[in-house]
A protein has these predicted regions:
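N-terminal binding-site loop/beta-alpha segment at the start of enzyme catalytic domains
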Residues: 1-86, 92
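Glycine/proline-rich, positively charged
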Residues: 23, 91-127
């Protein structure tokens, strides 16, 4: 399956800012049910960012997508902004960070990872 197949297989993409409690606090079960509903209705394009809930949206989405084959969805994220000052404060054990911040590497976003992905991108069918 090529990227175009994945992008057109669902009705919409799924933006995960609300999963990071952007508008209101969302329990983990509700976040998972929301992503599951999108998946069950054919959505396969997911957009997230480290800034959404100080990483909470990425963590919640990552837990859900880990249950599915990596070739069955497209994951988009943003890079370049870290919240290092918040990680190093006394608040790191507060409600915001109880979900595993500092992040664990699940997908390789390092320079080395990006360089490795370049040949992979060239092999993907865009037709």
């Amino acid at each position: 399956m090529g990227i175009r197949d994945l992008l057109v297989s669902g009705p919409l993409g799924f933006g995960t800012a609300p999963l990071g409690n952007m508008f209101r606090d969302i329990p983990d079960q509700e976040a998972e049910a929301t992503v599951d509903a999108a998946w069950e209705h054919g959505t396969r394009f997911f957009d997230t960012a480290p800034m959404y809930g100080a990483g909470l949206a990425e963590i919640r989405l990552g837990k859900y997508l880990a249950q599915h084959d990596r070739d069955d969805h497209v994951l988009s994220t943003k890079v370049g902004r870290l919240i290092l000052d918040e990680i190093d404060t006394d608040e790191r054990d507060s409600e915001m960070f109880k979900f595993g911040r500092a992040n664990r590497v699940v997908y390789d976003y390092t320079e080395k990872g990006a360089l490795k992905s370049n040949p992979i991108c060239r092999r993907v069918s865009w037709k």
